[in-house]
Regions:
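Surface-exposed molecular-recognition determinants
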Residues: 2-152
Length: 152
């Protein structure tokens, strides 16, 4: 008898097995402090049981403005605190190492990892930190977290 992740059935059905590792779903996240203009957002996720994996790529266009404040999650998180990897790219110049943190059960925030001191610290992004965002610059992250019991 097989069990799998958060599935409640003692024996997996073909339908349940087909959802594991299948195509990811898209969602439209709400992004605070950013005006999309002609920029683009790619946001995809998969949920297997209560485990949610997501990937987001936010690219500035010529009419985009602001910076990335918080980004809404595709599914409500069971708790705050999950951390994933992120990057901010000033195209043609540098890629800054960042983290993404679940800050509420519905939001995450990308933070810059500042290595200027003895220990790395996390700093909030702003309109000028780590640089002034322009066309083709991007913020991207991947994150894994546990969904709330109701799966919304």
């Amino acid at each position: 008898m097989a069990t799998f992740g958060g599935f409640t059935a003692a024996v997996l059905t073909a339908a349940e097995l087909n959802t594991a590792g299948g195509a990811w779903s898209t969602w439209t996240p709400t992004i605070a402090s950013w005006t999309q203009g002609n920029g683009t957002v790619v946001a995809v996720y998969e949920q297997v049981g209560r485990t949610v994996n997501c990937y987001v790529l936010i690219t500035w266009g010529t009419t985009s403005s602001g910076f990335i404040g918080t980004v809404s999650l595709p599914k409500t998180a069971a708790r705050i605190g999950a951390t994933g990897s992120a990057a901010v790219e000033d195209v043609g110049s540098f890629i800054a190492t960042c983290a993404v943190n679940v800050t509420t059960t519905t939001l995450c925030a990308v933070t810059l990892i500042n290595s200027a001191g003895t220990y790395g610290t996390q700093s909030a992004l702003s309109a000028t930190v780590p640089h002034t965002f322009g066309s083709t610059d991007n913020v991207r992250f991947s994150l894994t977290y546990e969904a709330a019991a109701d799966g919304t």
